[in-house]
């Protein structure tokens, strides 16, 4: 319900005020726009060494997880705190103070000493017509503030499936609450496959979609670019041309006021509760 949702929103703001207030330009930008993009995040020599470690880990990985979504193939190596100790640059990255502060400000939590887990991720793209990844349509991950951190290990052009975000769409204003109320009346609102673009035949959703996409930001950027986005806002994975490849470090990070999502039925967690 919008009332409970707004109550959580106030708690997040109070938690942020208490634990980690925004100070830097980037931290304030993350709160205001819902996304911050930082080029040349690491010094060039440090990034070169990190990329060498990245390639070495992927090449020798014994625990590579492979996900296929039609013509898209994603190879994921999960990095743990224990494993990162064997790789100095990965260890430094997991302890990067600027990165940790940005996450802490966004989530409203006390800064930690080290990020415990993150993923090394290689993507290969086939025929766009056979791409079955649902995330090529705009969506929001959850009903409360949570963050997605993407660190480009390779250059990302228009054809390399760039991350796309609608700035300020994370804000819990009246328009967003009204959208959630209207969305909750749709038959598919509780499904993971729900996408606003499937309902543009309805005037309200068409108008709302037009409004949020006026501030669409396509993150086309070189390697060594850091992206942190509040995925309560609308975002998507851009389309990729055939035979394109990409490499990133991904850190999903979310504070969940409902507790672990696995303990809650999927339909309730995703929509019906609201």
Which stretches of residues belong to each language-model region?
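Non-heme Fe(II)/2-oxoglutarate
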Residues: 11-12, 175-183, 225-274
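Generic beta-strand structural signal
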Residues: 116-118, 134-136, 145-151, 161
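Non-heme Fe(II)-dependent double-stranded beta-helix
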Residues: 1-32, 39-136
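Short, charged/polar surface micro-motifs in flexible loops or helix N-caps
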Residues: 99, 109, 127-128, 143, ...
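Histidine-centered catalytic micro-motifs
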Residues: 135-142, 234-237
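Active-site region of the double-stranded beta-helix
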Residues: 112, 139-142, 153-162, 168-170
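Double-stranded beta-helix
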Residues: 159-228, 234
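Short, conserved beta-strand element in jelly-roll/cupin
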Residues: 141-158, 220-221, 252-255
């Amino acid at each position: 319900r919008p009332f409970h949702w707004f109550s959580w929103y106030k708690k997040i703001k109070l938690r942020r005020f208490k634990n980690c207030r925004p100070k830097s330009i980037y931290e304030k930008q993350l709160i205001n726009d819902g996304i911050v993009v930082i080029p040349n995040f690491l010094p060039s020599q440090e990034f070169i060494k990190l990329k060498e470690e990245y390639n070495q880990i992927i090449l020798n990985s014994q625990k590579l997880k492979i996900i296929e979504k039609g013509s898209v193939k994603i190879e994921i190596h999960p990095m743990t705190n224990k494993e990162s100790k064997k790789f100095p640059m990965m260890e430094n990255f997991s302890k990067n103070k600027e990165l940790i502060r940005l996450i802490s400000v966004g989530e409203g939590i006390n800064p930690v000493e080290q990020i415990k887990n993150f993923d090394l991720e290689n993507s290969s793209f086939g025929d766009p017509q056979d791409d079955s990844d649902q995330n090529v349509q705009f969506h929001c991950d959850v009903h409360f503030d949570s963050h997605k951190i993407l660190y480009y290990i390779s250059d990302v052009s228009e054809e390399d499936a760039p991350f796309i975000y609608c700035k300020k769409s994370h804000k819990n204003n009246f328009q967003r609450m009204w959208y959630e109320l209207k969305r909750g009346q749709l038959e598919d609102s509780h499904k993971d496959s729900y996408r606003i673009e499937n309902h543009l035949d309805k005037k309200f959703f068409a108008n709302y979609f037009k409004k949020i996409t006026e501030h669409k930001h396509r993150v086309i950027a070189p390697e060594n670019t850091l992206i942190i986005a509040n995925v309560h806002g609308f975002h998507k994975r851009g389309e990729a041309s055939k035979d394109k490849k990409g490499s990133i470090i991904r850190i999903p990070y979310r504070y969940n006021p409902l507790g672990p999502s696995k303990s809650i039925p999927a339909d309730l967690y995703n929509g019906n509760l609201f």
